[in-house]
Amino acid sequence: MFDIGVGELTLIAVVALVVLGPERLPKAARFAGLWVRRARMQWDSVKQELERELEAEELKRSLQDVQASLREAEDQLRNTQQQVEQGARTLHDDVSRDIDIRASATPVATPLELAHADLSASPDVDATAGVTDAAGAAHTAPVIAQAQPIAPAPHQTLVPAPHDTIVPAPHAAHLASAPEPVAVAPVDAGTPAAWTPSAPAKLQEKQP
């Protein structure tokens, strides 16, 4: 701590021995040791305080540097925000100007002009409605005229079916060999009935 070498310590011990003598030298040595220890302790405490202060100053400096960097970043953010707001304002002004120019270029119809336009458009609508009604009537009239003449259905006369007769057992063989009855077709009222050759045979069969 005091940068004292071995030669210097021996010189101090010889001087103390000559001045104090052999009886007082041990007490003086103890007293000197206590003062040296106290001096070292104080020196260590001062050194620690200085180191703490230096560390605190370094921390302060680092904090100041960090604060300065944060301020710079905040200033940059403010500048960018101002630029963005200015750009948005200019864009809004340009859009509003374009809208105003277009609104001034397109004429605005007054209520009187709108009413006049409605009155002028109503006769055209009535005329078109009349034309469509006439066209619809023209299309429906031929359909009705074509549907009216309907030809009457031909009158058909119903001929009664021949009555079944009960034939006795001896004549069963004769009926088995007889021809089957022929179905008579419907005959119109205006045409005379045609003679069929099977009529005499049927009359003979009906006789007992």
Swiss-Prot record:
It is a single-pass membrane protein. Belongs to the TatB family. GO terms for cellular component: TAT protein transport complex. The chain crosses the membrane at residues 1-21. Its main location: membrane. It comes from Xanthomonas euvesicatoria pv. vesicatoria (strain 85-10) (Xanthomonas campestris pv. vesicatoria). It is found in: Cell inner membrane. The gene is tatB. Part of the twin-arginine translocation (Tat) system that transports large folded proteins containing a characteristic twin-arginine motif in their signal peptide across membranes. Together with TatC, TatB is part of a receptor directly interacting with Tat signal peptides. TatB may form an oligomeric binding site that transiently accommodates folded Tat precursor proteins before their translocation. The Tat system comprises two distinct complexes: a TatABC complex, containing multiple copies of TatA, TatB and TatC subunits, and a separate TatA complex, containing only TatA subunits. Substrates initially bind to the TatABC complex, which probably triggers association of the separate TatA complex to form the active translocon. It comes from the Bacteria. Keywords: Cell inner membrane, Cell membrane, Membrane, Protein transport, Translocation, Transmembrane, Transmembrane helix, Transport. GO terms for biological process: protein transport by the Tat complex. One of its GO terms (molecular function) is protein transmembrane transporter activity. Residues 178-208 are annotated as: Disordered. Residues 178-189 have a biased composition (Low complexity). InterPro entries: TatA/B/E, TatB. This is Sec-independent protein translocase protein TatB.
